[in-house]
Amino acid sequence: MEQLTRPMEDRKRQLLFCLACVFIWGLMAHAYGFLHSSFSHDSLLEFNGDGLSNRIRISNGRFLSPLCRWIFRTNMTLPWLVGVLGLLWIGLSAYLILRLFRLKTPAAAILVSGFLTANLTVSATAATFLHDFDCDMLALLMAVGAVFCWNRGKWGFLPGTVLMILSFGLYQSYICVSIVLILFVCIMELLDGEKTKNVIFKGLRACAMLLLGGIIYYALMKLVVRLSGIQMLSNVYNSLDRPAKLLEASWFDIRYVFKATYRLYFERIIQVLSPFPAVTQGATAALLAVSGLALFAEVLSSKVGWPEKLLVLVLAALVPFGGNLMHFVTMGSADHELMVYSYWLIYLLPLLLLPRLPWDKLAKPISWVKPVCAGLIVVLICAQVQVANVLYLKKDLEQDAYLSVMTRVVYRMEETEGYVPGETPVVMVGLPQQLNDTIPGFEAYRKPNGMWMTDVLNYGDSGHWAAYFKYILLNPAKITGGGKMTSDPRVQALPCYPAQGCTAIIDGTLFVKLSEP
């Protein structure tokens, strides 16, 4: 009886330890963001998912996000609850990865939990796109779970297909996570002595899982669009017809993007945003070099046959392509930090490959490689903990500064003769120009998606303005779109804020000119 219950107890302890590690790393890195309400950019526009946000999600193919919100939380973006849910999904993903590769040591759990929790994808999502954070991390869990099911047995790809459908419906880019994990599993099995034929058939089942999941997802998406009456986005950066550009591209363009897919994969991993770039770039380069040498050492060993050696090298060469697949299928036009979670799985390689080397037969100085590599991974994780906190602080400072400016703007609006709050239509022209483009010391942190401006709205459309007045200022202003009126000579003649006369009622509408349109 003890032999039956002991594995279950070991798995339970590993799960709880893994969750504890994720939440400790998560609180260090992201508690600032989860305990503040610095909504901006898309998270401001989609603060309340009941309506616009849910329509946006369906229109770009992420039709399961509204369902996810309905099940686990309200349609509103609740920072702390969203953060806790996101960390829970990351913790379960980390546990499945540990089991997938039979990593049982506490050190492995600490490191895997660390780089899955503290990375630029998680930080950029939580800083600017918090409304999507829990859904995106659930997409991660579904992508990892699909690979876990596929690896469990011959027919595991069938439940894996269901999980891939769920992952696609939450955020399509997490297919790259599945691809990289599948490649890693196949490589490790070949190094363990599995025959090429068996691994190829297993790989074909993985391809069937991904392809079948994609086809069923697409059919369901079309059904949801038809039933909801919501039109799919087309020919914009995050629309699902982006990959069709690949079919229209010339051979020269495809070759260029193919090369860029590999180049950017390594560039973005090595040159990832960091408070001490030289240190983290050196650490990443060292980890990649050690992993490469360890892989070649394993390939050259006598226990691996020649067909297996060749297949290992082919699969290893596919890892950068699979990890950066979004860049290739969108022809380099739509990939950003939120779409590259698969990059950070590269830190698994030293944890998988180094323990396989015959350390008892190697020289003593070489035996220090394992703890040194573990230390380098900790350095990279700690760097991302700092990056996350800087991003959240930047958003917080910008929110305070923007509130100060807009408080004064509202005073001007209310002082305009004939303006009745909540009744007079209001058109905001442009964006405030009183904020510095950068905060001193934060210049390098403008690079991630959604962090490039100090402007909270980022876009000056009526939707963002209406959200700011409703949710931040709690002001009853009746924000409308200006349309062609913004090119009216009377509007163009208005001076920009803070000049006197920057507000005026024209044809019954209050125009507030903040900058030239």
Which stretches of residues belong to each language-model region?
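Membrane-interface transmembrane helices that cradle and orient dolichyl/undecaprenyl
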Residues: 143-157, 189-196
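Perimembrane helix-loop-helix junctions
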Residues: 178-211
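Cytosolic-side transmembrane helix boundary signature
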Residues: 188, 192, 341-375
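Membrane-interface micro-motifs in multi-pass membrane enzymes
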Residues: 58, 62, 86, 107-151, ...
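Transmembrane alpha-helix segments characteristic
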Residues: 114-117, 303-329, 379-380
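Membrane-interface alpha helices of multi-pass inner-membrane proteins
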Residues: 156-172, 177-178, 183
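Hydrophobic, aromatic-rich transmembrane alpha-helices
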Residues: 267-309
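Intrinsically disordered, polar/acidic, low-complexity terminal segments
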Residues: 2-55, 59, 69-92, 99-115, ...
